Amino acid sequence: MRDFNNIQITRLKVRQNAVFEKLDLEFKDGLSAISGASGVGKSVLIASLLGAFGLKESNASNIEVELIAPFLDTEEYGIFREDEHEPLVISVIKKEKTRYFLNQTSLSKNTLKALLKGLIKRLSNDRFSQNELNDILMLSLLDGYIQNKNKAFSPLLDALETKFTRLEKLERERRSLEDKKRFQKDLEERLNFEKMKLERLDLKEDEYERLLEQKKLLSSKEKLNDKIALALDVLENTHKITHALESVGHSAEFLKSALLEAGALLEKEQAKLEECERLDIEKVLEKLGMLSGIIKDYGSIAHAKERLGHVKNELHNLKEIDHHCETYHKEIERLKTECLKLCEEISGFRKEYLAGFNALLSAKAKDLLLKSPSLVLEEAPMSEKGAQKLVLHLQNSQLETLSSGEYSRLRLAFMLLEMEFLKDFKGVLVLDEMDSNLSGEESLAVSKALETLSSHSQIFAISHQVHIPAVAKNHILVFKENHKSLAKTLNNEERVLEIARMIGGSENIESAISFAKEKLKV
């Protein structure tokens, strides 16, 4: 295995789907070609692989994929690895419902897709809905090309991204202030009412508990008064008990201390009750009701105090709102000027290097037997990437009218540029029938492009022609035996026979084998 940081799928196991009763394949890095007669289950195999990543519905009772992804951060999902090169295992079990697991940790399908997002890049017939060849990608490629040519370009892009992000934040804050300004009078009235409601209460941390205690005392003060008075009367004569104990030679110090403490506690409670005599029960209940409402509205007295501070701050800010708006306006205008200047500098670089990039794109397209495409810079609303967009021109064609084969080859041309200048794709390429309906010459061109891409990414490609299997590092054959679909990785001798079958079927088998050996260089 090559020592690189890209994802690599090392194994696929499938149990009981519509085609395969049992499937167990091990994969190596590089290009893996998948071939076989029509209807044996090649696309079903690819669908099972995509199903493990949540990109298709699971088509089997059990799918298991082993992969190595050193850069993937799994700790956030409770999956810890001692070694980042330790294989991860995705399991998909389908019974009444479909369940997803990563290293035996259960995850929802959406969570799994979010974690593995971007690890699988697929070229298929629904490519236009994916909008892969968009102006963001093309502009990123041009910028990557310029960065490779001129080191002064990257600082400009970084500075623009930082300043534009700050500009957007300030504009959002200014809009929020302006909204407040439009409703300033109404907002001030509501905040002042809330401030008055909170300030007229004594928002002490223990105030609610203190009032509850007062309510309890008031409701039972007469009974408590009688009990305390009776107890204090009894304590008046306890000296007779302690004197008698001392007379017969026993110490009464402990009892004296306890009786003194009991007397002090009762006198303290009696003082509380006397204080209650001065309380207005209606006012206590009224304030208690208000505090209950505050706790219900704000969660606690502490939260109400925090809210009071926030309300006061908001009222202060409303008084300063005109000043703040003016400050925001000046800062926004300053940042706009700086961003526009950076956009002009970036635009200058793009115009200078566009011809060279177009020449490179044309060369890639020519290698893939396509008419030369060209990219044209047009003005666009300012963003963190500048104030331009790239528009793809295809001589006498429109992108939407390209055949599936033409589009796939054009996408390959851009992939080759991505590999060279962006180097940020660390996933696996899955190509579904890439060479179907292509001429032999076109298929040969595609195989060369895939061979180049496979030095950077693992690739799985269903193939109907000999050129992709001939350059593939691994060749997987899907076939039927006793009416059951099977799949296996071919050795060199088996590869020769399969490529010979693809060339000429059962006719001219000797010349087909000779040609297959020549293609495989064996």
Curated annotation (Swiss-Prot):
InterPro entries: DNA_recomb/repair_RecN, P-loop_NTPase, RecF/RecN/SMC_N. Disulfide bonds: none annotated. It holds the Pfam family SMC_N. The keyword Nucleus does not apply. ATP binds at residues 36-43. It comes from the Bacteria. One of its GO terms (molecular function) is ATP binding. SUPFAM superfamilies: P-loop containing nucleoside triphosphate hydrolases (SSF52540). GO terms for biological process: DNA recombination; DNA repair; SOS response. Gene3D superfamilies: P-loop containing nucleotide triphosphate hydrolases. Keywords: ATP-binding, DNA damage, DNA repair, Nucleotide-binding. GO terms for cellular component: bacterial nucleoid. May be involved in recombinational repair of damaged DNA. Belongs to the RecN family. This is DNA repair protein RecN. The lineage of its organism: Bacteria, Pseudomonadati, Campylobacterota, Epsilonproteobacteria, Campylobacterales. The gene is recN.
